[in-house]
Amino acid sequence: AYQGVEGSYGHGAALQYFGQDADVYHVKSMEDAMVEVEEGRADYAVLPIENSSAGAVSDNYDLLVKHNVYIVGETELAVNHALLGLPGATLEDIRQVYSHPQALMQCSQYLNSHRQWRQVSMENTAVSAKKVLEDADVTQAAVASEIAGKLYGLKVLQPSINYNKNNVTRFIILAK
């Protein structure tokens, strides 16, 4: 189990660790992923624990103490954020940018150079991409992977916007 939707970095980490044919599924929150393991519905949970640019994902450390799960493995995933918009959208159209708080932080130099853009935190990068597609509003953009952009039919308005070009997230694999 991983948090987010298909095309999220958690999804990518799960497939990287377990293989492309692995039976993986998504849940809404990091805590939900841990509960899936605790209650026996999933053998494993895949959660981000640390990023080379933004540091520790402290909420997940807190959840590790709260839940009866154990770290049984880890994998590192290269993270390369792009600014994604609807086909036909331009940078000049953008007014709101959606993404996970960690991704917004990792892209802060680029995003802050566009002061007119309102940054809106969401639970996941790929969820943000899906929202932009579903809302069909050219003033919206998402910070997510180019893979998520392709999956949800979005256009890359600006590739590689994270300030650390060697951006890596360490994911932990949890079991009961």
Each language-model region and where it sits:
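Domain-level signature for soluble enzymes in the chorismate/prephenate branch of the shikimate pathway
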Residues: 1-176
